[in-house]
Protein backbone atom coordinates (compact mmCIF):
# COMPACT_ATOMS: atom_id res chain seq x y z
CA UNK A 1 0.00 0.00 0.00
CA UNK A 2 2.79 2.40 0.93
CA UNK A 3 4.58 1.52 -2.31
CA UNK A 4 1.46 2.41 -4.32
CA UNK A 5 1.13 5.77 -2.55
CA UNK A 6 4.78 6.63 -3.25
CA UNK A 7 4.35 5.63 -6.89
CA UNK A 8 1.22 7.77 -7.23
CA UNK A 9 3.04 10.71 -5.61
CA UNK A 10 5.97 10.38 -8.05
CA UNK A 11 3.62 10.23 -11.03
CA UNK A 12 1.78 13.31 -9.80
CA UNK A 13 5.07 15.15 -9.29
CA UNK A 14 6.26 14.18 -12.76
CA UNK A 15 3.00 15.34 -14.26
CA UNK A 16 3.32 18.68 -12.49
CA UNK A 17 6.87 19.21 -13.76
CA UNK A 18 5.78 18.53 -17.32
CA UNK A 19 2.99 21.08 -17.06
CA UNK A 20 5.25 23.80 -15.56
CA UNK A 21 5.44 26.99 -17.63
CA UNK A 22 8.09 29.68 -17.47
CA UNK A 23 7.05 32.83 -15.67
CA UNK A 24 7.47 36.03 -17.66
CA UNK A 25 9.33 38.45 -15.40
CA UNK A 26 8.94 42.23 -15.69
CA UNK A 27 11.76 44.01 -17.54
CA UNK A 28 14.62 45.44 -15.48
CA UNK A 29 15.10 49.17 -15.22
CA UNK A 30 18.56 49.15 -13.61
CA UNK A 31 20.69 47.82 -16.45
CA UNK A 32 24.40 47.39 -15.73
CA UNK A 33 25.88 49.69 -18.32
CA UNK A 34 29.47 50.58 -18.95
CA UNK A 35 29.73 54.35 -18.56
CA UNK A 36 32.08 56.16 -20.93
CA UNK A 37 33.90 58.09 -18.21
CA UNK A 38 37.01 59.53 -19.86
CA UNK A 39 39.06 59.78 -23.04
CA UNK A 40 42.84 60.12 -22.80
CA UNK A 41 44.93 61.15 -25.80
CA UNK A 42 48.71 60.74 -25.74
CA UNK A 43 51.09 61.86 -28.47
CA UNK A 44 54.41 60.05 -28.86
CA UNK A 45 57.57 60.80 -30.83
CA UNK A 46 57.84 57.39 -32.48
CA UNK A 47 55.75 55.79 -35.20
CA UNK A 48 52.46 54.15 -34.30
CA UNK A 49 50.52 53.83 -37.51
CA UNK A 50 47.41 51.78 -36.84
CA UNK A 51 45.41 50.01 -34.15
CA UNK A 52 46.82 46.57 -33.35
CA UNK A 53 44.42 43.84 -32.23
CA UNK A 54 45.51 42.38 -28.88
CA UNK A 55 48.13 45.06 -28.18
CA UNK A 56 46.47 46.60 -25.12
CA UNK A 57 46.33 44.79 -21.77
CA UNK A 58 44.71 45.99 -18.56
CA UNK A 59 44.41 45.29 -14.86
CA UNK A 60 42.16 47.11 -12.39
CA UNK A 61 41.59 47.30 -8.65
CA UNK A 62 39.45 49.11 -6.08
CA UNK A 63 41.10 49.71 -2.69
CA UNK A 64 40.11 52.16 0.06
CA UNK A 65 37.66 53.96 -2.26
CA UNK A 66 40.36 54.49 -4.88
CA UNK A 67 39.72 53.05 -8.35
CA UNK A 68 42.85 52.15 -10.31
CA UNK A 69 43.55 50.90 -13.81
CA UNK A 70 46.89 49.99 -15.43
CA UNK A 71 47.18 49.72 -19.22
CA UNK A 72 50.15 48.51 -21.26
CA UNK A 73 50.61 48.68 -25.01
CA UNK A 74 52.14 50.69 -27.85
CA UNK A 75 55.30 51.23 -25.78
CA UNK A 76 53.46 52.90 -22.88
CA UNK A 77 52.28 52.03 -19.41
CA UNK A 78 49.33 54.14 -18.27
CA UNK A 79 48.40 54.12 -14.59
CA UNK A 80 45.27 56.07 -13.61
CA UNK A 81 43.61 56.43 -10.22
CA UNK A 82 40.32 58.14 -9.33
CA UNK A 83 40.39 59.06 -5.64
CA UNK A 84 37.53 58.77 -3.14
CA UNK A 85 34.95 57.30 -5.48
CA UNK A 86 32.15 54.73 -5.44
CA UNK A 87 32.81 53.49 -8.95
CA UNK A 88 35.52 51.30 -10.39
CA UNK A 89 36.99 50.77 -13.82
CA UNK A 90 35.38 47.98 -15.81
CA UNK A 91 37.00 48.22 -19.24
CA UNK A 92 39.24 50.19 -21.57
CA UNK A 93 39.96 50.36 -25.28
CA UNK A 94 42.81 51.86 -27.29
CA UNK A 95 43.02 53.16 -30.83
CA UNK A 96 45.68 54.87 -32.93
CA UNK A 97 44.94 58.21 -34.59
CA UNK A 98 46.86 60.38 -36.99
CA UNK A 99 50.28 61.90 -36.23
CA UNK A 100 51.29 59.19 -33.73
CA UNK A 101 48.44 59.80 -31.29
CA UNK A 102 47.04 57.10 -29.02
CA UNK A 103 43.44 57.41 -27.84
CA UNK A 104 42.31 55.57 -24.71
CA UNK A 105 38.63 55.08 -23.84
CA UNK A 106 37.94 54.42 -20.15
CA UNK A 107 34.72 52.88 -18.85
CA UNK A 108 33.50 52.84 -15.24
CA UNK A 109 30.52 51.53 -13.30
CA UNK A 110 29.14 55.04 -12.70
CA UNK A 111 29.27 58.45 -14.33
CA UNK A 112 31.94 60.94 -13.31
CA UNK A 113 29.93 64.11 -13.92
CA UNK A 114 27.82 63.93 -10.75
CA UNK A 115 30.74 64.46 -8.36
CA UNK A 116 34.08 66.12 -9.05
CA UNK A 117 36.92 63.71 -8.48
CA UNK A 118 40.64 64.19 -8.18
CA UNK A 119 42.50 62.09 -10.72
CA UNK A 120 46.09 60.89 -10.83
CA UNK A 121 47.73 59.74 -14.09
CA UNK A 122 51.22 58.31 -14.55
CA UNK A 123 52.47 57.64 -18.09
CA UNK A 124 55.71 55.71 -18.50
CA UNK A 125 57.64 55.28 -21.75
CA UNK A 126 58.58 51.62 -21.57
CA UNK A 127 61.26 51.73 -24.26
CA UNK A 128 62.72 55.27 -24.15
CA UNK A 129 64.45 56.66 -21.02
CA UNK A 130 61.75 55.30 -18.74
CA UNK A 131 63.76 56.13 -15.61
CA UNK A 132 63.73 59.90 -16.17
CA UNK A 133 60.78 61.93 -14.89
CA UNK A 134 59.94 64.46 -17.59
CA UNK A 135 56.88 66.05 -16.00
CA UNK A 136 55.28 65.93 -12.56
CA UNK A 137 52.65 68.54 -11.75
CA UNK A 138 49.04 69.21 -10.82
CA UNK A 139 46.82 70.43 -13.63
CA UNK A 140 43.71 72.48 -12.79
CA UNK A 141 40.59 71.62 -14.67
CA UNK A 142 40.71 73.80 -17.76
CA UNK A 143 36.94 74.06 -18.23
CA UNK A 144 35.47 74.60 -14.78
CA UNK A 145 38.46 74.31 -12.38
CA UNK A 146 36.42 72.26 -9.92
CA UNK A 147 38.88 69.39 -9.49
CA UNK A 148 42.51 68.63 -10.21
CA UNK A 149 44.51 66.04 -12.09
CA UNK A 150 48.14 65.34 -11.34
CA UNK A 151 50.09 63.93 -14.28
CA UNK A 152 53.49 62.28 -14.03
CA UNK A 153 55.39 61.39 -17.20
CA UNK A 154 58.39 59.08 -17.00
CA UNK A 155 60.55 59.02 -20.13
CA UNK A 156 61.11 61.19 -23.17
CA UNK A 157 58.62 59.79 -25.66
CA UNK A 158 55.48 61.82 -24.82
CA UNK A 159 54.73 64.92 -26.91
CA UNK A 160 51.32 65.84 -25.47
CA UNK A 161 48.59 64.61 -23.15
CA UNK A 162 44.90 65.51 -23.09
CA UNK A 163 42.31 64.07 -20.71
CA UNK A 164 38.59 64.69 -21.12
CA UNK A 165 36.15 63.41 -18.51
CA UNK A 166 32.56 62.56 -19.40
CA UNK A 167 32.97 62.98 -23.17
CA UNK A 168 29.90 63.69 -25.27
CA UNK A 169 30.90 61.72 -28.35
CA UNK A 170 32.19 58.26 -29.23
CA UNK A 171 33.07 56.29 -32.33
CA UNK A 172 29.72 55.04 -33.71
CA UNK A 173 31.45 51.82 -34.82
CA UNK A 174 32.69 51.00 -31.30
CA UNK A 175 30.57 48.02 -30.27
CA UNK A 176 32.11 46.60 -27.08
CA UNK A 177 29.76 45.81 -25.45
CA UNK A 178 27.03 46.51 -27.98
CA UNK A 179 24.28 48.77 -26.62
CA UNK A 180 25.60 48.50 -23.06
CA UNK A 181 27.57 51.70 -22.64
CA UNK A 182 26.40 55.28 -22.15
CA UNK A 183 28.04 58.46 -23.36
CA UNK A 184 25.22 61.01 -23.63
CA UNK A 185 26.52 63.15 -20.77
CA UNK A 186 24.07 66.03 -20.93
CA UNK A 187 25.37 68.04 -17.98
CA UNK A 188 28.07 70.00 -19.78
CA UNK A 189 28.79 72.09 -16.69
CA UNK A 190 30.03 68.99 -14.84
CA UNK A 191 32.55 67.83 -17.45
CA UNK A 192 36.30 68.27 -17.13
CA UNK A 193 39.28 68.75 -19.43
CA UNK A 194 42.99 68.65 -18.66
CA UNK A 195 45.96 69.03 -20.99
CA UNK A 196 49.71 69.44 -21.20
CA UNK A 197 51.96 69.69 -24.25
CA UNK A 198 55.68 69.61 -24.91
CA UNK A 199 56.30 69.52 -28.67
CA UNK A 200 52.88 69.47 -30.32
CA UNK A 201 50.36 72.25 -30.02
CA UNK A 202 47.67 71.15 -27.59
CA UNK A 203 44.98 71.34 -30.26
CA UNK A 204 46.93 68.66 -32.15
CA UNK A 205 46.28 66.39 -29.19
CA UNK A 206 42.52 66.71 -29.64
CA UNK A 207 41.53 63.74 -31.78
CA UNK A 208 38.11 63.21 -33.29
CA UNK A 209 37.48 59.84 -31.73
CA UNK A 210 34.60 59.24 -34.11
CA UNK A 211 37.20 58.61 -36.82
CA UNK A 212 39.31 56.04 -34.95
CA UNK A 213 39.27 52.27 -34.86
CA UNK A 214 39.52 50.80 -31.35
CA UNK A 215 40.32 47.43 -29.84
CA UNK A 216 39.21 46.51 -26.34
CA UNK A 217 42.00 45.92 -23.81
CA UNK A 218 42.49 42.37 -22.59
CA UNK A 219 42.25 41.74 -18.85
CA UNK A 220 45.26 40.19 -17.15
From Swiss-Prot:
Pfam families: Pox_M2 (PF04887). It is found in: Host endoplasmic reticulum; Secreted. It comes from the Viruses. GO terms for cellular component: extracellular region; host cell endoplasmic reticulum. InterPro entries: Poxvirus_M2. Keywords: Early protein, Glycoprotein, Host endoplasmic reticulum, Host-virus interaction, Inhibition of host NF-kappa-B by virus, Secreted, Signal, Viral immunoevasion. Glycosylated by host. Homooligomer. Interacts with host CD80 and CD86 when secreted. Plays a role in immune evasion. When secreted, inhibits T-cell activation by preventing the binding of host CD80 and CD86 to soluble CTLA4 and CD28. In the infected cell, may inhibits host NF kappa B activation. Belongs to the orthopoxvirus OPG038 family. This is Early protein OPG038. It comes from Vaccinia virus (strain Copenhagen). The lineage of its organism: Viruses, Varidnaviria, Bamfordvirae, Nucleocytoviricota, Pokkesviricetes. The gene is OPG038.
Amino acid sequence: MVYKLVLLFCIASLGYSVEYKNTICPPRQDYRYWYFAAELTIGVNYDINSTIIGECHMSESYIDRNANIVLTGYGLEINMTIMDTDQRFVAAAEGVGKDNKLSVLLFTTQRLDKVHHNISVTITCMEMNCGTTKYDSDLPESIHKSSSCDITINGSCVTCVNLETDPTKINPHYLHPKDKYLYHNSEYGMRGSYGVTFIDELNQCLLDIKELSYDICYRE
